[in-house]
């Protein structure tokens, strides 16, 4: 697609805090991404390299997320650091963008959802940041697409609870709009835009690539972010499944698990 954003798209972005761009990836790019995600999901656990996270589902322990991928996959590295994805992120931010973090959320059948939250509390090292999701599979309300409350992204952090999420009582008062996606669609959203997603209640996966970009002027802080994240995870007592973490905030509503 033409990645030049129109005035109406920019107006919608400024008003709502998010914008969906259908067919952002070409059919060939979408197929490549699907194959890459299949490859990455089959990588063996290696805590010195990429970071796999797992969850308990009705079908057993399945991958929930893989992150810190860039150095280990040339195709993913090129897609995320060159061309239309960082260019579009920069256009929406109003200045050049650089990748801050990357992850694949698999959300296999029975996979857990995510409580209402904003991404910003998890990003201590940056001020100007934006998230992009790319659909690998179709995302629907039934399999756990994202839901947003528009027009709240300029109010800063909203009623945070002890887990770094939006307080559930406050979240229940908001009007949530689903944003279904087709493979290859892109969804850009402010890290202050409140969003959530339900569990996957279908028999098909809802795999999505999530990317966060920060302003290049703030520096390349990706390695610093992941070093800090690894340190924080290393401090978690992993003797009980309920204490495992897949994120620096407690928004995951599934059941983190050790790989079996």
From Swiss-Prot:
The protein's required cofactors: Fe(2+)
Catalysis: reaction(s): methylphosphonate + 2-oxoglutarate + O2 = hydroxymethylphosphonate + succinate + CO2
InterPro entries: Phytyl_CoA_dOase-like
Free-text remark on how the cofactor is bound: Binds 1 Fe(2+) ion.
Sites where the protein binds 2-oxoglutarate: 107
Keyword line: Dioxygenase, Iron, Metal-binding, Oxidoreductase
PANTHER family in the cross-refs: ECTOINE DIOXYGENASE, PHYTANOYL-COA DIOXYGENASE DOMAIN CONTAINING 1
Organism for this UniProt entry: Gimesia maris (strain ATCC 29201 / DSM 8797 / 534-30)
Broadest EC class assigned to this enzyme: oxidoreductase
Reported function: Part of an oxidative pathway for utilization of methylphosphonic acid as a phosphate source. Catalyzes the conversion of methylphosphonic acid to hydroxymethylphosphonic acid. Is specific for the hydroxylation of methylphosphonate.
Protein's UniProt name: Methylphosphonate hydroxylase
Stretch forming the signal peptide: none
E.C. code: 1.14.11.71
Family: Belongs to the PhyH family.
Residues the entry annotates as binding Fe cation: 117, 119, 195
């Amino acid at each position: 697609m033409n990645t030049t954003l129109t005035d109406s798209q920019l107006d919608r972005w400024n008003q709502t805090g998010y914008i969906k761009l259908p067919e952002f990836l070409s059919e060939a790019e979408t197929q490549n991404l699907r194959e890459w995600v299949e490859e990455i999901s089959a990588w063996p656990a290696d805590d010195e390299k990429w970071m796999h996270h797992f969850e308990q589902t009705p079908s057993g322990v399945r991958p929930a997320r893989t992150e810190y991928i860039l150095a280990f996959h040339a195709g993913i590295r090129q897609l995320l650091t060159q061309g239309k994805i960082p260019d579009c992120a920069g256009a929406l931010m109003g200045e050049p963008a650089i990748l801050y973090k990357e992850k694949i959320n698999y959300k296999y059948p029975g996979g857990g959802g995510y409580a209402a939250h904003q991404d910003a509390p998890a990003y201590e090292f940056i001020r100007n940041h934006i998230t992009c999701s790319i659909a690998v599979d179709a995302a629907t309300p039934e399999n756990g697409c994202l839901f947003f409350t528009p027009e709240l992204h300029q109010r800063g952090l909203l009623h945070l609870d002890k887990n770094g999420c939006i307080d559930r009582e406050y979240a229940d008062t908001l009007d949530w709009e689903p944003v279904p996606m087709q493979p290859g669609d892109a969804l850009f959203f402010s890290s202050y835009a409140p969003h959530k997603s339900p569990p996957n209640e279908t028999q098909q996966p809802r795999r999505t690539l999530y990317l966060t970009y920060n302003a290049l002027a703030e520096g390349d802080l990706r390695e610093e972010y992941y070093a800090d994240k690894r340190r924080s995870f290393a401090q978690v007592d992993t003797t009980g499944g309920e204490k495992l973490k897949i994120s620096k905030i407690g928004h995951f509503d599934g059941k983190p698990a050790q790989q079996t």
